[in-house]
C-alpha cells in the first residue's frame, strides 16, 4: 500500500518536482561545503593539504557522502529529464514559444546547462581526484595540483565558464526549490528571488576567484 502511494506520488508532476527539489538541495549543500573547503587555498598549501588529509582520514564518511551524492545526482537528472519530456508533450509549440520569451534566461538554460555542468564534474574528478588529465598531478598535494591545473588557460577558462553556468543553474534551481517545497507567497517572491540571486552569485564568484587568483599569480 505504502509502496503504491509512493509510486503514484513520484510518477506525478508534483512528485517529480519534489524529488528534483530535495535532491537539488542536497547537491547545493555539497557545493557550498566544497567551496568553503576550497577557499582554504588562500591560507596556503599547508592548510589546504591538511584539510584534504583530514577528509581522507574518514574513508567511511567520505564514501557514504559520495554514494549519497551519486544517488542524488541520478535522481536530480532523471527527474529533470522526465519533467522536460512531460512539458514538451503537454504544451503546444505556440505556447512553448510564448513561454520562452516570458521566462528568464536562467530558466531557459536549465536543461542545456545541466549536461555541461555534468561534463565539467566528470572532468573535475579526472583532474583533481584521479589525476588522469593532469600531467603534474601529485598524490596528496592538493594545493600544487590546483595551481598546476589552473595555470593552464584552457582549463581555467572551462572552469570559469562552468561556474557561470552553475551560478545561473543555482539561481533558477533555488527559486524553483522554494516553490516546490511550499516556501512561496506572492508577498515574498521578490525577496526569495533576491536571496537565490545573492547565494548563486556568491558561490559562482567564490569558485571563479580561485583560477583567477592562480592566473594572476596571487596563488602560486
Give each language-model segment a name:
Residues 1-220:
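Membrane-embedded alpha-helical bundles that constitute the cytochrome b-like, heme-associated redox core
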Amino acid at each position: 500500500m505504502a509502496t503504491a502511494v509512493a509510486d503514484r506520488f513520484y510518477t506525478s508532476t508534483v512528485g517529480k518536482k519534489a524529488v528534483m527539489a530535495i535532491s537539488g538541495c542536497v547537491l547545493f549543500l555539497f557545493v557550498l561545503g566544497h567551496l568553503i573547503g576550497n577557499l582554504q587555498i588562500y591560507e596556503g598549501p599547508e592548510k589546504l593539504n591538511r584539510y584534504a588529509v583530514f577528509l581522507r582520514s574518514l574513508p567511511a564518511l567520505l564514501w557514504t557522502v559520495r554514494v549519497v551524492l551519486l544517488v542524488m545526482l541520478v535522481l536530480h537528472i532523471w527527474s529533470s529529464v522526465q519533467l522536460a519530456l512531460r512539458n514538451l508533450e503537454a504544451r503546444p509549440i505556440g505556447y512553448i514559444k510564448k513561454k520562452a520569451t516570458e521566462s528568464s534566461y536562467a530558466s531557459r538554460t536549465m536543461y542545456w546547462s545541466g549536461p555541461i555542468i555534468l561534463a565539467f564534474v566528470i572532468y573535475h574528478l579526472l583532474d583533481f581526484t584521479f589525476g588522469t588529465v593532469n600531467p603534474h598531478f601529485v598524490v596528496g598535494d592538493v594545493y600544487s595540483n590546483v595551481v598546476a591545473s589552473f595555470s593552464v588557460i584552457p582549463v581555467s577558462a572551462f572552469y570559469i565558464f562552468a561556474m557561470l553556468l552553475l551560478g545561473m543553474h543555482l539561481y533558477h534551481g533555488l527559486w524553483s526549490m522554494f516553490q516546490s517545497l511550499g516556501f512561496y507567497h506572492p508577498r515574498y517572491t521578490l525577496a526569495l528571488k533576491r536571496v537565490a540571486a545573492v547565494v548563486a552569485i556568491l558561490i559562482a564568484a567564490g569558485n571563479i576567484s580561485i583560477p583567477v587568483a592562480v592566473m594572476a599569480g596571487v596563488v602560486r
